[in-house]
Amino acid sequence: MATTAPNLHSLSSSFAFSNPSSNVSATSFTFQIPNKKAQISCISSKKLHTQKSFNFHDAVTPMNKPSFGRDLMVAQATEAVAPTTEEAATSQPKTSKKAKKLKYPRRILDVYQILQSPIITEAAIKNIADENSLLFTVDVRADKKMIREAISNFFGVKVRKVNTLIRPDGTKKAYIMLNKEYNASELAKKIGIFPGGN
């Protein structure tokens, strides 16, 4: 049996259970609508249970509360997937264009570095007379093309062939054979290999 008082400001309800096996003999509810708070008292045959400051809004509409944790996770995932334009501009890697360095030639050898000194031995003098060739000690880094260009530019003669040899002591010797139109003996006098040269 249930009775309800028709009051707009306060509502009270009482319920009676006729089941003898139940421990609760009577239960009464009192609601205060303007304050949205209610006091629930349960009268039992053994114990008296009282709960104070019960939130009526939580009891009536528990499903209308937004799930803040899930909404926050969704918002964070959305921000991570679609960043703003400012963040996108700052997050892109910046590639700086460096100024190109000047490439210098690896071998910088002038004529005086390539042709170090003429070789004045009996075998070298014999080669001057017999094979129309000169012998020079040259730089180890100089190749045949560089030696040919150095002789042509420095002495003004045409070179027919260049042979090179590296000695056991690490120095490099060059056999420079001139064309037939040039005389190696006259060039040797100009250099100072033979006495009486200019």
Swiss-Prot record:
General function of this protein: Component of the chloroplast ribosome (chloro-ribosome), a dedicated translation machinery responsible for the synthesis of chloroplast genome-encoded proteins, including proteins of the transcription and translation machinery and components of the photosynthetic apparatus.
UniProt subcellular location: Plastid, Chloroplast
Note in the entry: Two forms of the protein exist; they have the same N-terminal sequence and approximately the same molecular weight.
Gene: RPL23
GO cellular component: chloroplast; cytosolic large ribosomal subunit
Subunit structure and binding partners: Component of the chloroplast large ribosomal subunit (LSU). Mature 70S chloroplast ribosomes of higher plants consist of a small (30S) and a large (50S) subunit. The 30S small subunit contains 1 molecule of ribosomal RNA (16S rRNA) and 24 different proteins. The 50S large subunit contains 3 rRNA molecules (23S, 5S and 4.5S rRNA) and 33 different proteins.
SUPFAM superfamilies (alphabetical): Ribosomal proteins S24e, L23 and L15e
Transit peptide feature range: 1-76
InterPro entries: Nucleotide-bd_a/b_plait_sf, Ribosomal_uL23-like, Ribosomal_uL23/eL15/eS24_sf
Highest rank taxon of the organism: Eukaryota
Example of a GO MF term: rRNA binding
Transferase in keyword set: no
Protein's GO biological process: translation
Similarity field: Belongs to the universal ribosomal protein uL23 family.
Record key words, sorted: Chloroplast, Plastid, Ribonucleoprotein, Ribosomal protein, RNA-binding, rRNA-binding, Transit peptide
Protein name, entry field: Large ribosomal subunit protein uL23c
